C-alpha cells in the first residue's frame, strides 16, 4: 500500500470506528448499514460528489455545507451525518471511500457476515451462487455475501477471495502451473 493510501486508510479507520461505536450505542446499526449502502451508491454515481470530496478548490465551509446538504437530502443517520461534517471541517473528506469500506466491514463483522469476492469465467446461476455461499458459510461459520464478477480470460473455474484467503480453481491458473512444471523438467 502506498504511503498516501495508508494514511487515508488510517484516517478513515479512526472515523469509521467512532461512527460505528456511536451508531452501536444508539442501536442504529441497521440504519447505518442502509446509509453506507446509499452513500456508496451516491459516490459511485455522482462525479460532482467525488469532485467535492477530493478537490482542494473547495473551502472547509463549502465542503461542510455541501456534505450537510447531501446528508440531509439522503436522510443519513446522526452519527454518520455528524461524522461527515466533522471530516469536512478537518479537510478529511478525501478519505470517504475508505471510511465507507471500513464501516461496511465493521457492520458485517457485527452481524456475523463476511463478503466473498468471486470471479468466474462465466456468470454463476442463482443455484450455483447459493450453493457456493452455503459452502463458504459452512467453512466460516458466518453468513457469506457474494460479490460476483465475470472474467472470461480465466477460461473456466473461479477465484474466491474470502478475507485473507484466496482459492483459485481456474483453468488459467492450472495451465500456468503446468507450464511452470514443464519448464522445470525440460
From Swiss-Prot:
One matching Pfam family: OSCP
GO CC terms, sorted: plasma membrane; plasma membrane-derived chromatophore membrane; proton-transporting ATP synthase complex
Membrane topology value: Peripheral membrane protein
Gene3D superfamilies hit by this protein: N-terminal domain of the delta subunit of the F1F0-ATP synthase
Main location: membrane
Entry superkingdom: Bacteria
Location in or out of the cell: Cellular chromatophore membrane
Subunit structure of this chain's protein: F-type ATPases have 2 components, F(1) - the catalytic core - and F(0) - the membrane proton channel. F(1) has five subunits: alpha(3), beta(3), gamma(1), delta(1), epsilon(1). F(0) has three main subunits: a(1), b(2) and c(10-14). The alpha and beta chains form an alternating ring which encloses part of the gamma chain. F(1) is attached to F(0) by a central stalk formed by the gamma and epsilon chains, while a peripheral stalk is formed by the delta and b chains.
Name the UniProt record assigns to this protein: ATP synthase subunit delta
Species of provenance: Rhodobacter capsulatus
Phylogenetic placement of the source organism: Bacteria, Pseudomonadati, Pseudomonadota, Alphaproteobacteria, Rhodobacterales
Amino acid at each position: 500500500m502506498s504511503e498516501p493510501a495508508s494514511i487515508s486508510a488510517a484516517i478513515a479507520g479512526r472515523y469509521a470506528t467512532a461512527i460505528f461505536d456511536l451508531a452501536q450505542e444508539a442501536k442504529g446499526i441497521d440504519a447505518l448499514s442502509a446509509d453506507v449502502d446509499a452513500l456508496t451508491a451516491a459516490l459511485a454515481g455522482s462525479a460532482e460528489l467525488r469532485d467535492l470530496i477530493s478537490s482542494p478548490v473547495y473551502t472547509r465551509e463549502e465542503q461542510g455545507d455541501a456534505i450537510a446538504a447531501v446528508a440531509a437530502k439522503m436522510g443519513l443517520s446522526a452519527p454518520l451525518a455528524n461524522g461527515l461534517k466533522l471530516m469536512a471541517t478537518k479537510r478529511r473528506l478525501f478519505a470517504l471511500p475508505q471510511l465507507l469500506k471500513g464501516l461496511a466491514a465493521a457492520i458485517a463483522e457485527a452481524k456475523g457476515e463476511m463478503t466473498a469476492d468471486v470471479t468466474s469465467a462465466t456468470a454463476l446461476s442463482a443455484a450455483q451462487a447459493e450453493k457456493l455461499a452455503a459452502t463458504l458459510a459452512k467453512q466460516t461459520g458466518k453468513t457469506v455475501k457474494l460479490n460476483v464478477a465475470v472474467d472470461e480470460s480465466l477460461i473456466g473455474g473461479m477465484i474466491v477471495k474470502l478475507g485473507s484467503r484466496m482459492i483459485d480453481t481456474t483453468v488459467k491458473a492450472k495451465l500456468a502451473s503446468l507450464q511452470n512444471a514443464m519448464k522445470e523438467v525440460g
